[in-house]
Amino acid sequence: MRRHEVRFAVDAPRHRVWRAFHPRVPPPTGSRRVFEYDGGRIEIIREGDEHGEGLVRTCEFPVPRWLGSGGVARSWEVVTEVRPDEFASYEAVGKPLWSRATGSHELTDLPDGRTGLTFVETYDAFNPVLRTLFEARVHAFISRRNEQTYEALLARLGRVERLS
């Protein structure tokens, strides 16, 4: 199993950072919400409760082309815990390297008035042979992209500094 952790500080209040990652749910229109970003896509299948706990989504995101999936991975994810303006976690199953992942982000108030964001993800390929051959490289690739995505979203709110 692989684990990745990254920390950022952003010049924005905690509630604005939270809202960037957890936008208010629009009134039902009969269609699913879809978020598209550079190289990826998230489709909300079920909204979850008023805070997003229980939300179910499918995600498409880049992976190395040598996995034979055309450079695209897919995951099915459920948000398992939410503490508004503070913490959210999810569990996921993904392919093409069949795997289980968990992830979370936690927001904290920093002494200088900025907001700290810590993102943690674990990744575990089911097949022991594929785990040995590919897990480290695939997770490193996904982790780099996750860091870029988090940093780009935070940069919309204010100046961002990577802390670790």
Segments predicted by a language model, with ranges:
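A short, structured loop/turn motif at beta-sheet edges
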Residues: D11-H15, E50-H51, T80-F87, E106-T118, ...
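Hydrophobic/aromatic beta-strand elements that line small-molecule binding cavities or substrate pockets
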Residues: V6-F8, R74-E81, A101-D109, E121
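A conserved amphipathic terminal alpha-helix motif
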Residues: T122-S164
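Amphipathic hydrophobic-ligand
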Residues: M1, L97-S104, S143
